[in-house]
């Protein structure tokens, strides 16, 4: 039921390009980036939290948007700092092929755009997101490409 565990399971059991680097240091870095997104940024900005803010706490839409924008900015600032200028950051979060980290980054930026978060302060993240968007696998996984998309 946890996305990172499912992705790692599929990576280990299915043929195709690996989503984790071959070296232990690279794997640790990719996991740190992915977990930073999945464990630090996403949980406080998911739909369940926003519904609780509005329902149980009576937050207005403006207050929920302020919450979302604040926490997304805080998380993306840290992620941009982690990736920008790092010698292993290349076309993607780690190297020149997509990794588990990129699989986490792309949906987080999709959600940030959905909530009209300004993203200009994150040029490294935007560059990586654009590189992912060029790939058929990311195009096919995009929310709008799903059968149940509205």
Regions found by a protein language model. Name each.
Residues 7, 11, 31-34, 76, ...:
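Non-transmembrane alpha-helical segments in soluble domains
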Residues 60-71, 121:
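Residue-level preference for long, well-ordered alpha-helices that form the structural scaffold
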Residues 19-29, 68, 88-101:
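All-alpha amphipathic helical-bundle segments outside canonical DNA-binding/catalytic cores
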Residues 121-150:
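Long hydrophobic alpha-helical segments typical of transmembrane helices together
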Residues 16, 81-94, 137-141:
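Surface-exposed helix-capping loop/turn segments at secondary-structure junctions
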Residues 1-63:
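GST-like domain detector, emphasizing the conserved glutathione-binding G-site
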């Amino acid at each position: 039921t946890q996305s990172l565990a499912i992705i790692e399971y599929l990576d280990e059991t299915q043929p195709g390009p690996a989503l984790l680097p071959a070296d232990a240091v690279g794997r640790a870095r990719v996991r740190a980036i992915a977990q930073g997104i999945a464990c630090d940024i996403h949980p406080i900005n998911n739909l369940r939290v926003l519904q609780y803010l509005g329902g149980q706490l009576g937050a207005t839409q403006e207050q929920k948007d302020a919450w979302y924008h604040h926490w997304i900015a805080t998380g993306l600032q840290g992620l941009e700092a982690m990736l920008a200028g790092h010698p292993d950051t290349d076309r993607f979060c780690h190297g020149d092929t997509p990794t588990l980290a990129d699989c986490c980054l792309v949906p987080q930026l999709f959600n940030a755009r959905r909530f009209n978060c300004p993203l200009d302060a994150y040029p490294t993240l935007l560059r990586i997101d654009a590189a992912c968007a060029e790939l058929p696998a990311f195009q096919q996984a995009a929310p709008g490409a799903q059968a149940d998309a509205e």
